[in-house]
């Protein structure tokens, strides 16, 4: 039996008082008022309501070390990324490795593997596989249903997955960027209960009024807190907090859910509403076995210096102190590498990177315009515009002066043809960046100032069988990711440090993006508008069809 004194923040009854909690056998035995001189605050541990652990570039047991240091005791996690690469084997890897740490990880069943039929993935989880996985007790919900056209149009395989979740009594997570009106009503009507993709206030309010829970996302690239934070006070029972995709440097240097508690208070939000969004709502919505600092609950709680600065002093999970005084108190265990990577190196000629410009007599420049992806810093959605390409020796090349760069996507699963597009707002003046983290099928994606830079960056990835790369053809820096080409087995601090070096190098090469590799990773995600490049071609998400690089006359 252990006792802890502090100012207890009772989020359920919305009050603070000096008191003592008694813990026995991993449970909270008593919570009682008691006078003392301790100034620390005791409150329920935080919950990330939607996260892809793979985006931390660390395996679950290493991610846990970063999370508990920020007061996180549980996460609702979608193993969608590794499932696209390794299928059920990848899901089992995540489950197994998560047990090497005390962090409570509640995995879901990926609903869209692959995300679309328009790209190559390492696995397919069809309706039969999803039904089988949902029957498992160690998988808690149906992960984000990204195929909203399939829901609205009633595709049989999509509807079968939704019915399996209902049959098992499990929550269905949503993913519906920009979905409004009648289509949204249809989407919610089939039982989809959450959305973390709202990028306007009006869209989020419409979804809440139709019965959805809104997850306010603040990750490394997609950041919606500034737009949506007022919902926390306006609709306190309908909002949760999540990161979705956070890189290791963000987790270590900026924080996890704790940073949103701080920012919310800076905005003048009610502290109890913030804690409700960060703890109570996800626990209740997903039915998580996570304590809310009540008698009889699991002893999952944190102590902080004060509620404004919200510096986490200690973290307890099931009554055990797992973090205190700046130290993680559970060991880091060796993790075996697992991967699927079947690509050989490329060359400029073999990859056909030299794409001829098409001439026309209708333009003063004497050539046809091309479709250009327009990246937006801090957002997953892109725009598109038409532009005249830069041409050398009859071939289209990157144009760093106009910030229109060549981008390639190629399958990691086979030596299939290289797909070529052009992108604006990456900002490189020289060199290239490349990654095997490329949502959602995690093929190889690269952007560069010259074809040579692109080829050398891609080939370094092939040598490493995955990871991220930055630099010029003559001087490349890399971070190998030996687990599925998505995650490292190194300590989170080391991964974060190396990742920061790569970001700094990318900035030296000209980019001003806050998180260039995170932005790059979403330029092949064919379910988020507007124009993306997959391993089978240029894809207009709004039209849900492939389009030609050259614009129509």
Curated annotation (Swiss-Prot):
The keyword rRNA processing does not apply. Its EC number is 3.5.4.2. Its cofactor is Mn(2+). NCBIfam families: ade. The gene is ade. The keyword Hydrolase applies. GO terms for molecular function: adenine deaminase activity. Pfam families: Adenine_deam_C, Amidohydro_1. Belongs to the metallo-dependent hydrolases superfamily. Adenine deaminase family. It catalyses: adenine + H2O + H(+) = hypoxanthine + NH4(+). InterPro entries: Adenine_deam, Adenine_deam_C, Amidohydro-rel, Metal-dep_hydrolase_composite, Metal_Hydrolase. This is Adenine deaminase. It is an enzyme of class 3 (hydrolase). It comes from Methanosarcina acetivorans (strain ATCC 35395 / DSM 2834 / JCM 12185 / C2A). GO terms for biological process: adenine catabolic process. Keywords: Hydrolase, Manganese.
């Amino acid at each position: 039996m252990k006792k802890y004194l502090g100012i207890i923040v009772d989020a359920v009854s919305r009050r603070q008082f000096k008191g003592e909690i008694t813990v026995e056998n991993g449970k909270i035995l008593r919570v009682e008022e008691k006078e003392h001189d301790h100034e620390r605050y005791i409150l329920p541990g935080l919950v990330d309501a939607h996260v892809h652990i793979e985006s931390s570039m660390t395996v679950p047991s290493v991610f846990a070390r970063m999370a508990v240091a920020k007061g996180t005791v549980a996460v609702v996690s979608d193993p969608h990324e590794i499932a696209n690469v390794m299928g059920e084997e990848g899901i089992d890897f995540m489950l197994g490795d998560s047990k090497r740490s005390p962090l409570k990880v509640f995995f879901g069943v990926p609903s869209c593997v692959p995300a679309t039929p328009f790209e190559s993935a390492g696995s397919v989880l069809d309706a039969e596989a999803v039904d089988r996985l949902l029957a498992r007790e160690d998988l808690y919900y149906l992960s984000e249903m990204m195929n909203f056209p399939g829901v609205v149009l009633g595709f049989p395989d999509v509807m079968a997955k939704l019915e399996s979740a209902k049959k098992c009594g499990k929550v269905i997570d949503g993913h519906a960027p920009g979905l409004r009106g009648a289509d949204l009503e249809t989407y919610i009507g089939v039982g989809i209960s959450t959305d973390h993709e709202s990028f306007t206030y009006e869209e989020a309010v419409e979804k809440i009024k139709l019965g959805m829970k809104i997850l306010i996302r603040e990750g490394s690239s997609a950041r919606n807190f500034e737009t949506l934070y007022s919902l926390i006070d306006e609709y306190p029972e309908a909002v949760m907090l999540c990161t979705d995709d956070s890189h290791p440097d963000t987790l270590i240097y900026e924080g996890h859910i704790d940073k949103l508690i701080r920012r919310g208070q800076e905005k003048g939000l009610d502290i109890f509403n913030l804690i409700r969004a960060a703890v109570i709502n996800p626990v209740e919505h997903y039915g998580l076995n996570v304590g809310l600092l009540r008698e009889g609950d699991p002893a999952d709680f944190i102590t902080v210096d004060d509620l404004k600065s919200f510096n986490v002093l200690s973290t307890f999970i099931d009554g055990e102190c797992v973090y205190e005084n700046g130290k993680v108190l559970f060991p880091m265990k060796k993790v075996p590498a697992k991967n699927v990577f079947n690509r050989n190196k490329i060359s400029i000629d073999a990859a056909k990177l030299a794409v001829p410009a098409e001439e026309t007599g209708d333009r003063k420049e004497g050539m046809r315009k091309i479709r250009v992806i327009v990246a937006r810093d801090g957002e997953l959605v892109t725009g598109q515009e038409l532009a005249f390409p830069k041409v050398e020796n009859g071939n289209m090349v990157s144009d760093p002066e106009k910030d229109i760069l060549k981008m390639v996507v190629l399958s990691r699963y086979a030596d299939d043809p290289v797909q070529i597009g052009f992108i604006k707002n990456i900002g490189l003046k020289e060199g290239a960046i490349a990654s095997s983290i490329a949502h959602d099928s995690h093929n190889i994606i690269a952007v560069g100032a010259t074809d040579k830079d692109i080829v050398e960056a891609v080939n370094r990835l092939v040598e490493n069988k995955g990871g991220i790369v930055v630099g010029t053809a003559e001087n490349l820096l890399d971070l190998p990711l030996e687990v599925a080409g998505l995650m490292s087995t190194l300590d989170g601090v080391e991964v974060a440090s190396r990742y920061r070096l790569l970001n700094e190098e990318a900035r030296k090469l000209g980019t001003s993006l806050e998180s260039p590799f995170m932005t790059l990773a979403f330029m092949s995600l064919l379910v988020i508008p507007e124009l993306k490049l997959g391993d089978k071609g240029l894809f207009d998400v709004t039209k849900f069809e492939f389009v030609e690089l050259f614009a129509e006359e």
